[in-house]
């Protein structure tokens, strides 16, 4: 749907605004950063969940990823993006109840790459192949997920049992069912870093752990096409010798399309790089207690508190900040409304903030915030609505 020349002040609130030129520029900069190091970007779709922004992530031929391979967080996303992208990685170790749908998607595109970090994942995929011999037309395409220190998912690369999984599918009894693509790690613990220097050191550590394991597998005779690392913080502070020293040839950031207050606080972006805002309406003002009330609560902003480890919570705890007046912060979100206070308790200029007027909020965590909405209003540099994007929803 095209909404040319519409003013954002006419929109019902709360709603999401996507800053088109900012998002495009974020995509280009990440691709250029990776290309300068000689590595691919396999972008994650989970933040924006839209075909349009997925295309932005491959614009201007800056991305060395010629297969236009992407990552999704759900099979619903996989089906949604399969209309445009044919090399998809499903980023969660596969549960048995997802196997059938995953294989049907695999058959419909060039390949659906599936994660495993446990022999039970392999068994469930083999079991499906054995029970459905007429449907099993091509091997499963798989990545081994390894743990580089986040401790959420992934096999321990130091254990022999991890390498035994690779042997099982490459040379062992499961060989006829699998095509091994490579290894994948995710440094989600980068969001707990204190400084950009800490993130740079963690990026080196993830590259070392993942790269060394890739080299080990190759030394044992295994073909490892892809060694993939990343999170948006790490991919914003990549070591210059990523490929030459560590053998890492792919990164997989996701949040960088939008960024958010967390990324800003961590030093991964500037405020002007944040490509998504929540538009809200001031529903009441309280000069006597120096507060505003807006119609964007937890169901519009999420309740993610962000980088609390970087804040003096007695002074600056917040669930988002006000665009163009970052001294104002969202506090105490309830379901449909939130209070706004000033960071240092300085007097709010109520002449600027009237009941019924609109404000734009920079969210703590854009992935969760964007997921709250069924459409995005795309705006240009003049704050005019130029398009509407509809994201994939649910599972």
Swiss-Prot record:
It comes from the Eukaryota. Its EC number is 4.3.1.18. InterPro entries: Ala_racemase_N (IPR001608), D-amino_acid_metab_enzyme (IPR051466), D-ser_dehydrat-like_dom (IPR026956), D-ser_dehydrat-like_sf (IPR042208), PLP-binding_barrel (IPR029066). It catalyses: D-serine = pyruvate + NH4(+). One of its GO terms (biological process) is D-serine catabolic process. It is an enzyme of class 4 (lyase). Pfam families: Ala_racemase_N, D-ser_dehydrat. Zn(2+) binds at residues 365, 367. Pyridoxal 5'-phosphate binds at residues 184, 191, 232, 254-255. Disruption phenotype: Knockout leads to a loss of D-serine degradation activity and an accumulation of D-serine within the organism. Delays development with a prolonged period spent at the mound stage and decreased spore formation. Decreases expression of acaA and carA-1 during starvation. Its cofactor is pyridoxal 5'-phosphate; Zn(2+). One of its GO terms (molecular function) is D-serine ammonia-lyase activity. The modification N6-(pyridoxal phosphate)lysine is found at residue 46. Keywords: Detoxification, Lyase, Metal-binding, Pyridoxal phosphate, Zinc. Catalyzes the conversion of D-serine to pyruvate and ammonia. Plays a role in D-serine detoxification. Belongs to the DSD1 family. This is D-serine dehydratase. It comes from Dictyostelium discoideum. The gene is dsd.
